[in-house]
UniProtKB/Swiss-Prot annotation:
InterPro entries: ATP-guanido_PTrfase, ATP-guanido_PTrfase_AS, ATP-guanido_PTrfase_cat, ATP-guanido_PTrfase_N, ATP-guanido_PTrfase_N_sf, Gln_synth/guanido_kin_cat_dom. Residues 6-88 form the Phosphagen kinase N-terminal domain. Keywords: ATP-binding, Kinase, Nucleotide-binding, Transferase. Residues 116-353 form the Phosphagen kinase C-terminal domain. ATP binds at residues 119-123, 182, 226, 278-282, 306-311. GO terms for molecular function: arginine kinase activity; ATP binding; creatine kinase activity. Substrate binds at residues 61-65, 222, 269, 311. It catalyses: L-arginine + ATP = N(omega)-phospho-L-arginine + ADP + H(+). It is an enzyme of class 2 (transferase). GO terms for biological process: phosphocreatine biosynthetic process. Its EC number is 2.7.3.3. Belongs to the ATP:guanido phosphotransferase family. This is Arginine kinase.
Length: 358
């Protein structure tokens, strides 16, 4: 039963997997393993907690999670190497957070005609600095964290005011409605499961959303908090402002979020840290998507294009999810700006290709 395997058993499985191409396999050398295998974080986390999922799922892309915020210090030898490779940065020099001046944003509605952009969404991940991540969290700690979070939700006012729905004991009607709204999160990811992400499911987990349903927070899904602002159309400014006001409100309520110098905001998976921000649009680009240069066009703009139902899904009706690729090494405002520039370039190219067909 490898689910409870020792660090030695996990290492043996990883070390013997010649075909494994994960970042964990690439960066956890024998020397690093020997230096880290007996260390513990202040939350009681171990190397085994960090690498379990990547050793059980040898087809992982990343293969390593941080067991808690302190893991980024205690296991920095391997985590820093993984972070540099994943985020394609030579050194870890993430700037201080900078959301920009909300009264002087460099963007507004990216598609006033409403012809191309179906919807716009910006989300961030945040972690409480006083709690561990899923592998080390007890059920009691998760429930206490949920209470701390709910107290912060009470501070939301105006358009952010809403209601919190715990997953545990949720009525069938609420479940059905949230599934239809695409708000509900599930426990069906094997990588996350083996990392401890679904321990004590579904206790201490829930969803907050405002009355207009254009702002929501996932509590204890993968990260402690995922704050999501979204709406139909292309008004990036409105979506971004709503999110920033929500983040500032939660911080002002007394919540303290985990950060580390050079890494920015810390998340369970090292692929999300830094700004921990993903800004995206669902956009109709059938002509651009059909062109052979589509991928390189997006790559040159630091834009990730994927199907509207998430990673590794196909487009539906020429609609693609376009988002900022970079999370680390730039400010929040710069990340959103980079997405804005990329989306506008895709929009211009789509119009040009459509006109050429006439």
């Amino acid at each position: 039963m490898l689910a409870m395997a020792s660090v030695e058993e996990l290492w043996a499985k990883l070390d013997g997997a010649a075909d494994c191409k994960s970042l964990l396999k690439n960066n956890l050398t024998k020397e690093r393993y020997e230096a880290l295998k007996d260390k513990k974080t202040k939350f009681g986390g171990t190397l085994a907690d960090c690498i379990r999922s990547g050793c059980l799922n040898l087809d992982s892309g990343v293969g390593i999670y941080a067991c808690d915020p302190d893991a980024y210090t205690v296991f920095a030898d391997v985590l820093d190497a993984v972070i540099k490779e994943y985020h394609k940065v030579p050194e870890l020099k993430h700037p201080e957070p900078e959301m920009g001046d909300l009264d002087k944003l460099n963007f507004g509605d990216l598609d006033p005609s409403g012809e191309y952009i179906v919807s716009t969404r910006v989300r961030v991940g945040r972690s409480h600095d006083s709690y561990g991540f899923p592998p080390v969290l007890t059920k009691q700690e998760r429930l206490k964290m949920e209470e701390d979070t709910k107290a912060a939700f009470e501070k939301f006012s105006g358009e952010l005011a809403g209601k919190y729905f715990p997953l545990e004991g949720m009525s069938k009607e609420d479940q059905k409605q949230m599934t239809e709204d695409h708000f509900l999160f599930k426990d069906d990811d094997r990588f996350l499961r083996d990392a401890g992400g679904y321990n004590d499911w579904c206790s201490g987990r829930g969803i907050f959303f405002n009355t207009a349903k254009n702002f929501l927070v996932w509590v204890n899904e993968e990260d402690h908090l995922r704050l999501i602002s979204m709406q139909k159309g292309g008004d990036l400014a409105a979506v971004y402002k709503r999110l920033v006001v929500a983040i500032n409100t939660m911080t002002a309520s007394g919540l303290s979020f985990a950060k580390r110098d050079g890494l920015g905001y810390l998340t369970f998976c090292p692929s999300n840290l830094g700004t921990a921000l993903r800004a995206s649009v669902h956009m109709k680009i059938p002509n651009l998507a059909a062109s052979p240069e589509f991928k390189s066009f997006c790559d040159n703009l630091n834009i990730q294009a994927r199907g509207i139902h998430g990673e590794h899904t196909e487009s539906v009706g020429g609609v693609y999810d376009l988002s900022n690729k970079r999370r680390l090494g730039l400010t929040e405002y710069q990340a959103v700006e980079e997405m804005r520039v990329g989306v506008e370039a895709c929009l211009a190219k789509e119009k040009e290709l459509a006109a050429a067909k006439k």
